[in-house]
């Protein structure tokens, strides 16, 4: 469990945790963190329930609700993950550059598609529900 005295400062085992992304799904608030790449669900009051670490990620940079699921973009590998019933499913590494720190910087839903912006390549990727593991690159 994580305790928050204010919206922007939380502690977990005595160390500060920064929340870097958030999304609401089924009336519940989910947040991603830095520096441990974890996802928490708001449990009421000052309490957050830890859902776990997303792979070996360090920061949850972006989150979006798409097709009834929570999608997660990360640093340092620019990976996209999906939250499936409390379990994280790896989907794709988007930024294939040789930079040591790659990230899915932003996510948004528009026109029935999920979009993801990346750094340092500066590319925007999109996918559509019902398509099998495809990411269009712009």
Q: What kind of feature is each model-predicted range?
A:
Residues 1-20, 24-28, 34-61, 65-69, ...:
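Trp- and S/T/G-rich repeat-edge/linker motifs of beta-rich repeat architectures
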């Amino acid at each position: 469990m994580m305790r928050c005295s204010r919206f922007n400062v939380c502690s977990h085992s005595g160390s500060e945790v920064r929340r870097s992304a958030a999304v609401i799904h089924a009336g519940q608030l989910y947040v991603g963190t830095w520096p441990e790449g974890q996802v928490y669900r708001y449990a009421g009051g000052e309490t957050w329930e830890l859902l776990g670490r997303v792979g070996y990620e360090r920061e949850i940079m972006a989150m979006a609700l798409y097709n009834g699921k929570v999608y997660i973009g990360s640093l340092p590998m620019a990976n996209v993950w999906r939250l499936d019933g409390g379990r994280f499913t790896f989907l794709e590494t988007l930024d294939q550059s040789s930079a040591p720190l790659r990230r899915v910087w932003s996510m948004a839903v528009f026109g029935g598609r999920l979009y993801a912006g990346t750094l340092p390549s500066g590319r925007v990727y999109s996918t559509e529900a019902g398509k099998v593991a495809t990411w269009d690159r712009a």
